[in-house]
């Protein structure tokens, strides 16, 4: 039995193309893997606090007393990391906003990137500590960006996930959403077809 974590990050709720793909994934996975456990976390509905000068102090080893706000951030960070570690398959709905990922997903990354916890520095360089995971990225875009210099989402996510130890990463694209209903419908259909294959693999 596998455990699956689905992370949504779109601010558009049910109107979101990436959220629709995430919901489709959940349906398909439940059908194909009936005994598996799926956890869905919506980072827009349950926003992660922005990392600032106060909160960053909570994520670094120190003997200093923590403020109530720092205590909350550290507890949330511990919760998110434990959740990430507990799951085998990590699904991220990551729409492109102004050429990059949503703030909601970046805030999540900022709280799980902790030296000595999710990665460590060694004589040979950084080493990720979140290992043995499979990641599936569902990324929707208004334009066509795949394999072009304007796609900052793919290299960034590969870099970050690899940095914390997740190197098995599959991308599913839904592009050209803003080009009109016909293109958007085809993009969703193509993405769902690929997702069906990914789920059954």
Curated annotation (Swiss-Prot):
It catalyses: 2 a quinone + NADH + H(+) = 2 a 1,4-benzosemiquinone + NAD(+); N,N-dimethyl-1,4-phenylenediamine + anthranilate + 2 NAD(+) = 2-(4-dimethylaminophenyl)diazenylbenzoate + 2 NADH + 2 H(+). Its EC number is 1.6.5.-, 1.7.1.17. FMN binds at residues 10, 16-18, 96-99, 140-143. Keywords: Flavoprotein, FMN, NAD, Oxidoreductase. Its cofactor is FMN. Binds 1 FMN per subunit. It comes from the Bacteria. GO terms for molecular function: electron transfer activity; FMN binding; oxidoreductase activity, acting on NAD(P)H as acceptor; oxidoreductase activity, acting on NAD(P)H, quinone or similar compound as acceptor. Homodimer. Quinone reductase that provides resistance to thiol-specific stress caused by electrophilic quinones. Also exhibits azoreductase activity. Catalyzes the reductive cleavage of the azo bond in aromatic azo compounds to the corresponding amines. PANTHER family: FMN-DEPENDENT NADH-AZOREDUCTASE 1, FMN-DEPENDENT NADH:QUINONE OXIDOREDUCTASE. Belongs to the azoreductase type 1 family. This is FMN-dependent NADH:quinone oxidoreductase. It comes from Yersinia enterocolitica serotype O:8 / biotype 1B (strain NCTC 13174 / 8081).
């Amino acid at each position: 039995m596998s455990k699956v974590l689905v992370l949504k990050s779109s601010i558009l709720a049910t109107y979101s193309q990436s959220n629709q793909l995430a919901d489709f994934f959940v349906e398909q996975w439940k059908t194909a893997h009936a005994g598996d456990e799926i956890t869905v976390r919506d980072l827009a509905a349950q926003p992660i606090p922005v990392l600032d000068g106060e909160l960053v102090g909570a994520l670094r080893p120190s003997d200093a007393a923590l403020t109530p706000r720092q205590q909350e951030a550290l507890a949330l960070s511990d919760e998110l990391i434990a959740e990430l570690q507990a799951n085998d398959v990590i699904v991220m709905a990551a729409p492109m906003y102004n050429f990059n990922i949503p703030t909601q997903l970046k805030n999540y990354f900022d709280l799980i990137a902790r030296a000595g916890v999710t990665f460590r520095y060694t004589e040979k360089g950084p080493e990720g500590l979140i290992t043995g995971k499979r990641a599936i990225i569902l990324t929707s875009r208004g334009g066509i960006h795949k394999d072009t210099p304007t796609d900052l989402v793919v290299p960034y996510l590969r870099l970050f996930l690899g940095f914390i130890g997740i190197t098995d990463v599959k991308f599913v694209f839904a592009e050209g959403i803003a080009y009109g209903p016909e293109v958007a419908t085809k993009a969703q259909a193509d993405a769902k077809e690929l997702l069906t294959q990914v789920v059954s693999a």
